Amino acid sequence: MTKKSTVQFEAGISLPTFLDRFGTEAQCREVVFQQRWPHGFQRTSCGSRSHCRPDTRDLLPCNRCKHQVSPTAGTLFAQTKLPLKTWFLAIYLLSQHKNGIWAMTLSRRLGVSCNTAWLLKHKLMQAMVEGEHDRMLHGVVQMDDAYHAIKGKYLQRYLSEFCYRFNRRFDLAGLVTQLILTATRTQPLPYRLAALDA
């Protein structure tokens, strides 16, 4: 009798369950708000803890200094033209595929251009680099039966993507929320930096 692999039979998060939790823009914005300010809104410069209702652009006007704050400002989602639900779906697809997902496949699944999918993937991989920063490999690293045509400047991102999923393989359901949390704590990464050395 063969022994079952605990990783192979680990319950992940199903697509319907994911869409129930993160299927609308409002749900995604609320998650980003909760991740960014877990103890409630607080403006760092003036210390105010109160804000007015968001305007049509989802900006939160501070009651004290009247500065408008976006929940996505200072995060990986900053100044994005894509809806947050597209970002969250990319996080789901990237985290739930055992061997990762190509930018071309991501582009087809999300309905975005290949360049947009590449940038989205590399931004999320940078968040994975940040999430794995304390677990960096050093010295010579050997992998069996793997050949990838990866540019050296992106190697750390691809390796971090693999390690991020591997180190969290026993909690596939929590992997999505963990990556969302990591993305809200990762600084913005414009294209010019995403295309440079990782």
Question: What positions do the PLM features span?
Answer:
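Residue-level recognition of single "structural anchor" positions
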Residues: M1-A198
